[in-house]
A protein has these predicted regions:
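Glycan-recognition/cleft segments
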Residues: 115-147
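Extracytoplasmic low-complexity segments
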Residues: 5, 18-78, 87, 93, ...
Length: 246
């Protein structure tokens, strides 16, 4: 399988306080998007949409030498960015990784019972494909990765060894290699589990950043599900290296 990378960046990764090894887009990068090109959309009257950014495919897309000093800033009230690309994300099977560099803006965000979403392209009710990646303090602080394995819904929880801090950059990485699914924070392993079968991250729904990706859905109390992120996202990359590593 051809190696495919989707890279989104807003600051030069060499300045990150988190370990940056392996984060630079390389010669296999086929799509690149700069967070700074978008301002934040916001849900209004519980029905609005955020801004849309189209990923432009290109051969050997380079990381720009001069980048803005800030990433995409989210207010936690419904602002988000939507990624439009054919089939949402072309990561269908084999080994993969998802990397996110972020920092939280408030203590209230980290204590919020519902947690927050970083990126995803499926709703809670979709079972056979797509993914969600976020944070939850419910029954212990953890990162949550919801996905589909052989057409069945699965959830991978990675408990935090210590609380997140506001104003600090973190590198979060979800990775599958062979039969191991792992979660790392600043290159430190948080959790690992064995998986056998095909994980399908692709979904026809566009991936949304900084919010629950199906903003029309409501909870049992008929409240709109938002769980918006409050903070800054600086870098996101998807890598599909396939079973043969090519």
């Amino acid at each position: 399988m051809k190696k495919i990378l989707f890279a989104l960046a807003a600051l030069t990764v060499s300045t990150l306080s988190a370990a940056s090894a392996g984060m630079e887009p390389d010669d296999n990068t086929v799509a690149f998007w700069d967070f700074s090109m978008q301002k934040q959309g916001q849900i209004e009257d519980q029905s609005g949409f955020g801004n849309t950014a189209a990923l432009q495919s290109m051969e050997n897309a380079p990381l720009p030498k001069i980048l803005p000093e800030e990433g995409a800033v989210f207010d936690g009230k419904g602002g988000y960015v939507q990624i439009q690309v054919k089939d949402s994300l072309k990561i269908r099977k084999g080994d993969f990784s998802i990397e996110v560099v972020f920092k939280c803006a408030s203590e209230e965000l980290l204590k919020r019972p519902s947690g927050f979403f970083l990126i995803g392209n499926k709703s809670h009710t979709e079972k056979i494909s797509g993914f969600l990646l976020g944070y939850s303090p419910w029954q212990g602080r953890k990162f949550c990765f919801q996905y589909a394995l052989d057409g069945k819904a699965r959830s991978f929880n990675a408990p935090l060894k210590k609380p997140l801090e506001t104003g600090k950059w973190y590198l979060l990485r979800i990775s599958r290699k062979g039969d191991k699914l792992s979660c790392l924070l600043d290159n430190q392993l948080l959790a690992e589990e064995k998986v056998q079968g095909e994980i399908s991250l692709v979904n026809m729904r566009a991936a949304r950043i900084g919010i629950y990706p199906a903003p029309w859905q409501r909870d049992k109390q008929n409240r709109l599900i938002v769980n918006g992120f409050e903070g800054t996202l600086r870098f996101i990359r998807f890598s599909d290296i396939g079973r043969d590593g090519k």
